[in-house]
Amino acid sequence: MGEVNIAPLGDRIIVKPIEREVMKSGIIIPDTAKEKPMEGEVVAAGPGKLGEKGERAPMDVKKGDKVLYGKYSGTEVKINDKNYLIMHQDDVLGIIK
């Protein structure tokens, strides 16, 4: 699977948060003052939500997409000593083009 060895189920995705260490002004933000990142990259996506008749709804996001998500979205997990979020596709606010 590449970066992660977990396959998300249903409409879940695994997102690698993109940390913003330095502000545009060049000020470095200490860890204690950082807010949770709200931008990330999808590193794995499930097959889609299973419908009542057994059909799969197609996923709107795919591996490699840069996404915006809510500040408190998802469940934080550590995989191979890196932090990721597992969330439902519905937690994604938009895809960055």
From Swiss-Prot:
GO terms for biological process: chaperone cofactor-dependent protein refolding. One of its GO terms (cellular component) is cytoplasm. It is found in: Cytoplasm. One of its GO terms (molecular function) is protein folding chaperone. It comes from the Bacteria. InterPro entries: Chaperonin_GroES, Chaperonin_GroES_sf, Chaprnonin_Cpn10_CS, GroES-like_sf. CDD domains: cpn10. Keywords: Chaperone, Cytoplasm. Its main location: cytoplasm. Transmembrane segments: none annotated. SMART domains: Cpn10. HAMAP family: CH10. Heptamer of 7 subunits arranged in a ring. Interacts with the chaperonin GroEL. Together with the chaperonin GroEL, plays an essential role in assisting protein folding. The GroEL-GroES system forms a nano-cage that allows encapsulation of the non-native substrate proteins and provides a physical environment optimized to promote and accelerate protein folding. GroES binds to the apical surface of the GroEL ring, thereby capping the opening of the GroEL channel. Belongs to the GroES chaperonin family. PANTHER family: 10 KDA HEAT SHOCK PROTEIN (PTHR10772), 20 KDA CHAPERONIN, CHLOROPLASTIC (PTHR10772:SF63). This is Co-chaperonin GroES. The gene is groES.
